[in-house]
């Protein structure tokens, strides 16, 4: 082996401990950036048509929130409580219809129905576009969660965030264009790039979100929701000057190798380019994630300082800061919405943790003039059954559930679609996950049929051969 090349590889091994995940996972394939900055894979790209939104914040509620207890008001479900469930044949046996466990009321000028679980979010009713006719293919968490993010229930495919970044690039070359805050454990498919270049996959911030775990257990098993940091963003072995000297020396070795006619490995050159960008990110990422400079009023707005809302409040505030810094796509995961039992206590706890921070995010974005350009999305992988499971729970329901959008060019104070009288199945303007993906891309200025990537001899797209845009919800 060429001695010079061997030395270069040694340098790469030592520097990788400081840049870690951030350098390799989020910043690969940067070979062309320095030679031709305009050709860099993350440089802003022209959309297919005029976008209504420039950024996305996806508030992902893992576990499947109960739509009939939150945003899908069903008077007949209340009237027929205790009767045998008409759609509960087979696996459900003699299940009984269970009414919503909280009262519903109308809010805003639009008169939008929302349950009492949302006292803060209800103040923003006229900003919300309720998608009451969502549907997906399977009532199983792993498959449905994968489909929510990638459009497929089983194959390894690029995620929604990766497709968005691939199609549009990002505004800040010193930050990742796709950030996922506290993604679930063992769920890299949900933020991965699959066959797209690795530069487009999400950069993970923190560990999985498991609300309700004691802090010690959270840190031990989940990384803790409060541990929202980028792994290895700082090099504990070398200061900035020493790192800069390392990179300069590696570049010098590159030049020496080229002058000797030995050539330069494209893979090694790409990694070095990643290091260069990661080096710049060391200064920018901590600044964006530093919440100490926020006013006390802003922290209080998000519920920071309150044990119940502290963690999710910090994450929502961090999302706003990433938006301000030019990041294209941010996802925040909040887990444990799978109430097969303990619905009353569990769903109330979940909503208490997210209601105030989500309302604060909408208010803060609007006050800063950012909401009009930012599409905020809330929802999970499917919904829950209108009938009971056990004494105090609801089972999975993939045929009809609710998500909502706000800002980013959607009509506020609107309910789109409808489920049947009990909330089992979408019966009007059904929005399958493929339709939802097509609509999100359209709001960002991307045609889901034209956003393709050629791999293994065929053109792939997020929506495969499906998907219709819900233009009725667009402002």
Role assignments for model-derived ranges:
Residues 1-475:
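Ligand-binding pockets and gating/stacking loops
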């Amino acid at each position: 082996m060429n001695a010079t090349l061997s030395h270069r590889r040694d340098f790469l091994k030592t520097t990788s401990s400081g840049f870690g995940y951030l350098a390799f996972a989020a910043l690969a394939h940067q070979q062309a950036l320095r030679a031709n900055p305009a050709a860099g894979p993350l440089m802003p790209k022209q959309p297919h048509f005029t976008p209504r939104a420039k950024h996305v914040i996806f508030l992902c509620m893992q576990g499947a929130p109960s739509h009939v207890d939150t945003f899908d008001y069903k008077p007949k479900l209340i009237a027929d409580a205790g009767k045998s469930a008409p759609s509960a044949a087979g696996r459900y046996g003699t299940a009984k219809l269970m009414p919503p466990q909280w009262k519903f009321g109308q809010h805003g000028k639009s008169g939008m129905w929302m349950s009492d679980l949302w006292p803060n979010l209800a103040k923003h009713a006229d900003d919300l576009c309720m998608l009451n006719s969502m549907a997906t293919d399977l009532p199983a968490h792993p498959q449905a969660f994968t489909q929510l993010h990638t459009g497929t229930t089983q194959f390894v495919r690029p995620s929604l965030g990766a497709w968005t970044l691939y199609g549009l690039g990002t505004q800040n070359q010193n930050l990742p264009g796709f950030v996922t805050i506290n993604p679930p454990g063992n769920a890299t498919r949900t933020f991965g790039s699959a066959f797209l270049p690795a530069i487009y996959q999400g950069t993970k911030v923190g560990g999985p979100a498991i609300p309700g775990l004691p802090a010690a257990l959270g840190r031990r098993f989940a990384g803790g929701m409060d541990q929202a940091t980028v792994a290895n963003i700082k090099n504990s072995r070398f200061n900035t000057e020493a790192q800069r000297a390392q990179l300069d020396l590696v570049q010098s070795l590159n030049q020496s190798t080229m002058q000797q006619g030995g050539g330069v490995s494209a893979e090694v050159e790409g990694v070095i380019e990643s290091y260069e960008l990661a080096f710049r990110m060391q200064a920018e990422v901590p600044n964006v994630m530093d919440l100490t400079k926020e006013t006390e009023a802003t922290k209080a707005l998000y519920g920071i300082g309150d044990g119940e809302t502290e963690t999710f409040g910090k994450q929502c505030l961090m999302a706003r800061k990433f938006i301000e810094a030019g990041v294209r796509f941010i996802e925040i995961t909040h887990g444990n919405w799978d109430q097969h039992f303990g619905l009353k206590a569990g769903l109330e706890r979940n909503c208490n943790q997210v209601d105030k921070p989500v309302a604060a995010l909408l208010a803060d974005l609007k006050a800063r003039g950012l909401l009009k350009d930012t599409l905020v999305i809330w929802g999970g992988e499917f919904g829950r059954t209108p009938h009971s499971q056990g004494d105090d729970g609801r089972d999975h329901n993939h045929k009809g559930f609710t998500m909502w959008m706000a800002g980013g060019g959607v009509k506020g104070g609107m309910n789109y679609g409808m489920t049947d009288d009990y909330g089992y199945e979408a019966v009007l303007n059904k929005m399958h996950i493929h339709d939802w993906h097509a609509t999100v891309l359209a709001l960002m200025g991307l045609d889901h049929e034209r956003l393709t990537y050629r791999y293994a001899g065929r053109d792939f797209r997020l929506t495969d051969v499906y998907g219709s845009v819900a233009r009725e919800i667009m402002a």
